[in-house]
Regions:
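A membrane-topology feature that recognizes alpha-helical transmembrane segments
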Residues: 1-325
Length: 325
Protein backbone atom coordinates (compact mmCIF):
# COMPACT_ATOMS: atom_id res chain seq x y z
CA UNK A 1 0.00 0.00 0.00
CA UNK A 2 2.79 2.42 0.94
CA UNK A 3 4.60 1.60 -2.29
CA UNK A 4 1.44 2.46 -4.23
CA UNK A 5 1.12 5.79 -2.42
CA UNK A 6 4.81 6.56 -2.94
CA UNK A 7 4.20 6.37 -6.69
CA UNK A 8 2.41 9.73 -6.52
CA UNK A 9 5.47 11.39 -4.95
CA UNK A 10 7.37 10.74 -8.17
CA UNK A 11 7.31 13.65 -10.66
CA UNK A 12 4.95 12.72 -13.55
CA UNK A 13 7.79 13.01 -16.07
CA UNK A 14 9.29 9.88 -14.49
CA UNK A 15 6.03 7.89 -14.68
CA UNK A 16 4.62 5.82 -17.55
CA UNK A 17 2.58 7.95 -19.95
CA UNK A 18 -0.86 6.75 -18.82
CA UNK A 19 -0.03 7.23 -15.15
CA UNK A 20 1.47 10.67 -15.83
CA UNK A 21 -1.64 11.81 -17.72
CA UNK A 22 -3.88 10.56 -14.91
CA UNK A 23 -1.88 12.34 -12.21
CA UNK A 24 -1.69 15.62 -14.13
CA UNK A 25 -5.39 15.51 -15.04
CA UNK A 26 -6.28 14.90 -11.40
CA UNK A 27 -4.02 17.79 -10.38
CA UNK A 28 -5.73 20.10 -12.89
CA UNK A 29 -9.22 19.17 -11.67
CA UNK A 30 -8.15 19.56 -8.05
CA UNK A 31 -6.65 22.97 -8.80
CA UNK A 32 -9.69 24.12 -10.78
CA UNK A 33 -11.97 23.21 -7.88
CA UNK A 34 -9.85 25.34 -5.58
CA UNK A 35 -9.93 28.05 -8.23
CA UNK A 36 -13.73 28.00 -8.00
CA UNK A 37 -13.47 28.47 -4.25
CA UNK A 38 -10.97 31.26 -4.87
CA UNK A 39 -13.67 33.16 -6.77
CA UNK A 40 -15.76 33.08 -3.61
CA UNK A 41 -12.82 34.37 -1.58
CA UNK A 42 -12.20 37.22 -4.03
CA UNK A 43 -15.86 38.26 -3.99
CA UNK A 44 -16.57 37.95 -0.27
CA UNK A 45 -13.41 38.78 1.68
CA UNK A 46 -13.48 42.52 0.81
CA UNK A 47 -17.07 42.67 2.09
CA UNK A 48 -16.25 40.90 5.33
CA UNK A 49 -18.52 37.98 4.44
CA UNK A 50 -18.03 34.31 5.25
CA UNK A 51 -16.40 32.27 2.49
CA UNK A 52 -18.21 29.14 3.70
CA UNK A 53 -21.86 30.15 3.95
CA UNK A 54 -24.24 30.87 2.33
CA UNK A 55 -23.93 28.97 -0.92
CA UNK A 56 -23.08 30.91 -4.07
CA UNK A 57 -25.94 32.76 -5.77
CA UNK A 58 -26.45 34.73 -8.94
CA UNK A 59 -25.63 38.36 -8.00
CA UNK A 60 -28.62 39.61 -10.05
CA UNK A 61 -31.55 37.24 -9.44
CA UNK A 62 -30.03 35.72 -6.27
CA UNK A 63 -30.96 32.19 -7.32
CA UNK A 64 -28.79 29.61 -5.61
CA UNK A 65 -26.24 28.11 -8.00
CA UNK A 66 -26.71 24.35 -8.27
CA UNK A 67 -23.88 21.84 -8.48
CA UNK A 68 -24.35 21.28 -12.22
CA UNK A 69 -23.94 25.01 -12.83
CA UNK A 70 -20.88 25.22 -10.62
CA UNK A 71 -18.50 22.88 -12.44
CA UNK A 72 -15.24 24.80 -12.93
CA UNK A 73 -14.77 26.21 -16.44
CA UNK A 74 -17.17 23.71 -18.04
CA UNK A 75 -20.38 25.19 -16.61
CA UNK A 76 -19.43 28.67 -17.81
CA UNK A 77 -18.90 27.33 -21.32
CA UNK A 78 -22.11 25.28 -21.36
CA UNK A 79 -24.17 28.18 -20.02
CA UNK A 80 -22.57 30.50 -22.59
CA UNK A 81 -21.52 32.89 -19.84
CA UNK A 82 -25.10 33.52 -18.71
CA UNK A 83 -27.15 32.71 -15.63
CA UNK A 84 -29.48 29.79 -16.31
CA UNK A 85 -32.40 31.54 -14.59
CA UNK A 86 -32.23 35.25 -15.40
CA UNK A 87 -29.82 35.37 -18.32
CA UNK A 88 -27.48 37.83 -16.62
CA UNK A 89 -23.94 37.75 -17.94
CA UNK A 90 -21.27 35.85 -16.02
CA UNK A 91 -17.85 37.49 -16.02
CA UNK A 92 -15.02 35.70 -17.81
CA UNK A 93 -12.99 36.22 -14.65
CA UNK A 94 -14.66 33.20 -13.04
CA UNK A 95 -13.39 30.60 -15.51
CA UNK A 96 -10.08 32.47 -15.76
CA UNK A 97 -9.43 32.11 -12.02
CA UNK A 98 -10.51 28.47 -12.19
CA UNK A 99 -8.12 27.92 -15.10
CA UNK A 100 -5.30 29.55 -13.14
CA UNK A 101 -6.06 27.20 -10.26
CA UNK A 102 -5.97 24.20 -12.58
CA UNK A 103 -2.70 25.28 -14.15
CA UNK A 104 -1.20 25.95 -10.71
CA UNK A 105 -2.10 22.45 -9.55
CA UNK A 106 -0.74 20.91 -12.72
CA UNK A 107 2.54 22.84 -12.60
CA UNK A 108 3.10 22.08 -8.91
CA UNK A 109 2.55 18.35 -9.35
CA UNK A 110 4.49 18.23 -12.62
CA UNK A 111 7.47 19.78 -10.86
CA UNK A 112 7.39 17.96 -7.54
CA UNK A 113 4.89 15.10 -7.68
CA UNK A 114 2.35 14.89 -4.86
CA UNK A 115 4.67 16.20 -2.15
CA UNK A 116 5.01 18.97 0.40
CA UNK A 117 6.89 21.28 -2.02
CA UNK A 118 4.03 20.86 -4.50
CA UNK A 119 1.48 21.82 -1.84
CA UNK A 120 3.62 24.80 -0.88
CA UNK A 121 3.90 26.03 -4.46
CA UNK A 122 0.17 25.52 -5.07
CA UNK A 123 -0.85 27.48 -1.97
CA UNK A 124 1.71 30.18 -2.79
CA UNK A 125 0.24 30.80 -6.23
CA UNK A 126 -3.43 30.64 -5.22
CA UNK A 127 -3.10 33.06 -2.32
CA UNK A 128 -1.22 35.51 -4.54
CA UNK A 129 -4.00 35.27 -7.13
CA UNK A 130 -6.63 36.10 -4.51
CA UNK A 131 -4.61 39.03 -3.15
CA UNK A 132 -4.03 40.36 -6.67
CA UNK A 133 -7.66 40.34 -7.79
CA UNK A 134 -8.88 41.87 -4.54
CA UNK A 135 -6.28 44.62 -4.84
CA UNK A 136 -7.32 45.24 -8.45
CA UNK A 137 -10.98 45.48 -7.44
CA UNK A 138 -10.68 47.52 -4.26
CA UNK A 139 -7.19 49.07 -4.05
CA UNK A 140 -7.06 47.33 -0.68
CA UNK A 141 -4.76 44.50 0.37
CA UNK A 142 -6.55 41.85 2.48
CA UNK A 143 -4.50 41.52 5.65
CA UNK A 144 -5.85 38.04 6.41
CA UNK A 145 -4.63 36.66 3.09
CA UNK A 146 -1.21 38.28 3.54
CA UNK A 147 -0.95 36.60 6.94
CA UNK A 148 -1.99 33.32 5.30
CA UNK A 149 0.75 33.72 2.68
CA UNK A 150 3.32 34.37 5.40
CA UNK A 151 2.09 31.30 7.27
CA UNK A 152 2.50 29.20 4.11
CA UNK A 153 6.11 30.27 3.73
CA UNK A 154 7.14 29.84 7.34
CA UNK A 155 4.86 26.88 8.05
CA UNK A 156 6.00 24.75 5.13
CA UNK A 157 9.60 25.75 5.74
CA UNK A 158 9.44 24.64 9.37
CA UNK A 159 7.49 21.49 8.51
CA UNK A 160 10.01 20.38 5.89
CA UNK A 161 12.87 21.22 8.25
CA UNK A 162 11.30 19.10 10.99
CA UNK A 163 10.55 16.17 8.68
CA UNK A 164 13.67 16.20 6.53
CA UNK A 165 16.23 17.95 8.69
CA UNK A 166 18.34 21.08 8.16
CA UNK A 167 19.68 19.77 4.84
CA UNK A 168 16.21 19.68 3.28
CA UNK A 169 16.06 21.30 -0.15
CA UNK A 170 13.70 21.69 -3.06
CA UNK A 171 11.23 24.15 -1.58
CA UNK A 172 10.57 27.71 -2.64
CA UNK A 173 13.49 29.11 -0.67
CA UNK A 174 16.14 26.41 -0.65
CA UNK A 175 17.12 24.76 2.61
CA UNK A 176 17.23 27.46 5.29
CA UNK A 177 14.24 28.64 7.32
CA UNK A 178 16.38 31.51 8.61
CA UNK A 179 16.59 32.84 5.03
CA UNK A 180 12.81 33.11 5.02
CA UNK A 181 12.68 34.91 8.35
CA UNK A 182 15.32 37.38 7.25
CA UNK A 183 13.59 37.76 3.89
CA UNK A 184 10.25 38.69 5.40
CA UNK A 185 11.64 41.21 7.87
CA UNK A 186 14.12 42.83 5.48
CA UNK A 187 11.63 42.98 2.58
CA UNK A 188 8.95 44.64 4.69
CA UNK A 189 11.38 47.22 6.07
CA UNK A 190 12.93 47.84 2.64
CA UNK A 191 9.66 48.67 0.89
CA UNK A 192 8.39 50.66 3.88
CA UNK A 193 11.47 52.87 3.63
CA UNK A 194 10.83 53.31 -0.09
CA UNK A 195 7.23 54.36 0.63
CA UNK A 196 8.38 56.96 3.17
CA UNK A 197 11.10 58.40 0.93
CA UNK A 198 8.87 58.45 -2.18
CA UNK A 199 6.11 60.19 -0.22
CA UNK A 200 8.51 62.88 0.98
CA UNK A 201 9.75 63.50 -2.56
CA UNK A 202 6.33 63.52 -4.24
CA UNK A 203 4.90 65.93 -1.68
CA UNK A 204 7.40 68.45 -3.02
CA UNK A 205 6.56 67.74 -6.67
CA UNK A 206 3.63 69.73 -8.07
CA UNK A 207 1.12 68.59 -10.67
CA UNK A 208 -0.13 70.79 -13.53
CA UNK A 209 -2.55 72.54 -11.16
CA UNK A 210 0.18 73.34 -8.65
CA UNK A 211 -0.93 70.76 -6.09
CA UNK A 212 1.43 68.24 -4.46
CA UNK A 213 1.49 64.91 -6.29
CA UNK A 214 0.92 63.28 -2.92
CA UNK A 215 -1.35 65.46 -0.72
CA UNK A 216 -0.73 65.73 3.04
CA UNK A 217 -2.21 62.77 4.87
CA UNK A 218 -1.76 60.41 1.92
CA UNK A 219 1.10 58.13 0.94
CA UNK A 220 2.84 57.41 -2.34
CA UNK A 221 1.94 53.74 -1.98
CA UNK A 222 -0.46 51.75 0.14
CA UNK A 223 0.93 50.10 3.25
CA UNK A 224 -0.46 46.79 2.07
CA UNK A 225 2.35 46.57 -0.49
CA UNK A 226 5.16 46.27 2.09
CA UNK A 227 3.08 43.57 3.75
CA UNK A 228 2.87 41.64 0.47
CA UNK A 229 6.63 41.90 -0.11
CA UNK A 230 7.27 40.79 3.46
CA UNK A 231 5.05 37.75 2.92
CA UNK A 232 6.94 36.98 -0.29
CA UNK A 233 10.16 37.20 1.71
CA UNK A 234 8.82 34.62 4.17
CA UNK A 235 8.12 32.33 1.19
CA UNK A 236 11.13 32.91 -1.06
CA UNK A 237 13.91 34.01 1.27
CA UNK A 238 15.89 37.24 1.34
CA UNK A 239 17.92 36.36 -1.77
CA UNK A 240 14.85 36.68 -3.99
CA UNK A 241 13.65 40.04 -2.73
CA UNK A 242 15.76 42.47 -4.83
CA UNK A 243 14.83 40.65 -8.03
CA UNK A 244 11.16 40.40 -7.01
CA UNK A 245 10.93 44.14 -6.34
CA UNK A 246 12.87 44.96 -9.52
CA UNK A 247 10.58 42.84 -11.72
CA UNK A 248 7.45 44.21 -10.05
CA UNK A 249 8.62 47.80 -10.52
CA UNK A 250 9.58 47.37 -14.18
CA UNK A 251 6.43 45.49 -15.17
CA UNK A 252 4.19 47.79 -13.14
CA UNK A 253 5.77 50.92 -14.62
CA UNK A 254 5.41 49.68 -18.20
CA UNK A 255 1.79 48.62 -17.77
CA UNK A 256 0.95 51.80 -15.86
CA UNK A 257 2.39 53.97 -18.63
CA UNK A 258 0.44 52.04 -21.27
CA UNK A 259 -2.83 52.30 -19.31
CA UNK A 260 -2.37 56.02 -18.75
CA UNK A 261 -1.41 56.66 -22.39
CA UNK A 262 -4.52 54.83 -23.61
CA UNK A 263 -6.80 56.69 -21.20
CA UNK A 264 -7.90 53.60 -19.31
CA UNK A 265 -7.17 55.14 -15.91
CA UNK A 266 -9.62 58.04 -16.31
CA UNK A 267 -13.21 58.32 -15.13
CA UNK A 268 -13.13 55.05 -13.22
CA UNK A 269 -15.63 56.25 -10.64
CA UNK A 270 -15.93 55.01 -7.04
CA UNK A 271 -14.44 51.66 -6.08
CA UNK A 272 -17.86 50.33 -5.04
CA UNK A 273 -21.19 51.39 -3.54
CA UNK A 274 -19.69 50.77 -0.09
CA UNK A 275 -16.45 52.63 -0.84
CA UNK A 276 -16.94 56.06 -2.45
CA UNK A 277 -13.18 56.66 -2.82
CA UNK A 278 -12.17 57.41 -6.43
CA UNK A 279 -8.61 56.39 -7.39
CA UNK A 280 -6.41 59.13 -8.89
CA UNK A 281 -6.00 59.07 -12.65
CA UNK A 282 -2.45 57.76 -12.35
CA UNK A 283 -3.11 55.16 -9.63
CA UNK A 284 -2.46 51.49 -10.39
CA UNK A 285 -2.53 48.81 -7.67
CA UNK A 286 1.03 47.58 -7.08
CA UNK A 287 0.07 44.35 -5.31
CA UNK A 288 -0.58 42.32 -8.48
CA UNK A 289 2.85 43.29 -9.83
CA UNK A 290 4.54 42.27 -6.60
CA UNK A 291 2.72 38.95 -6.86
CA UNK A 292 3.81 38.51 -10.47
CA UNK A 293 7.38 39.45 -9.59
CA UNK A 294 7.37 36.86 -6.82
CA UNK A 295 6.08 34.10 -9.10
CA UNK A 296 8.62 34.97 -11.82
CA UNK A 297 11.41 35.00 -9.25
CA UNK A 298 10.30 31.63 -7.89
CA UNK A 299 10.22 29.94 -11.29
CA UNK A 300 12.87 31.78 -13.30
CA UNK A 301 15.00 33.58 -10.71
CA UNK A 302 18.29 31.91 -11.54
CA UNK A 303 17.86 32.37 -15.30
CA UNK A 304 16.80 36.02 -15.02
CA UNK A 305 19.53 36.79 -12.53
CA UNK A 306 22.23 35.17 -14.65
CA UNK A 307 21.25 37.31 -17.65
CA UNK A 308 20.51 40.50 -15.77
CA UNK A 309 23.82 40.94 -13.95
CA UNK A 310 25.95 41.07 -17.13
CA UNK A 311 23.58 43.68 -18.58
CA UNK A 312 24.10 45.78 -15.46
CA UNK A 313 27.87 45.28 -15.61
CA UNK A 314 27.90 43.32 -12.36
CA UNK A 315 29.74 40.20 -13.44
CA UNK A 316 28.88 36.91 -15.08
CA UNK A 317 25.67 36.45 -13.13
CA UNK A 318 26.66 33.27 -11.23
CA UNK A 319 23.95 31.37 -9.45
CA UNK A 320 23.51 33.51 -6.34
CA UNK A 321 19.80 33.00 -5.84
CA UNK A 322 18.14 29.81 -4.69
CA UNK A 323 14.60 29.09 -5.74
CA UNK A 324 13.10 25.93 -7.14
CA UNK A 325 15.81 23.34 -7.45
Amino acid sequence: MLDDLALFAVPPRELPLVAAVFVLAAAFIFGALWGSFLNVVIARVPRGQSVVTPRSRCPKCETMITARDNIPILSWLLLRAKCRHCGAGISARYPMVELIGGVAGTVAVARFGVTLPAAELFCFILILVAISFIDLDTFRVPTGLVVALSAVGLGFGLLRWQLLGPEASGGLAGDDVVDRLIGGVVAGIMLSCIVIVATGVLRRVKDKDGNPRVPPGEWAMGWGDPMILAALGFCLGWQAMPLTLFLASVIGSVIGIVLKATGQLKDRGPISDDDPWIPPDDAVPFGPFLALGGVLAAFFGDAIHARLLPLLGLGDGGVLLRYLE
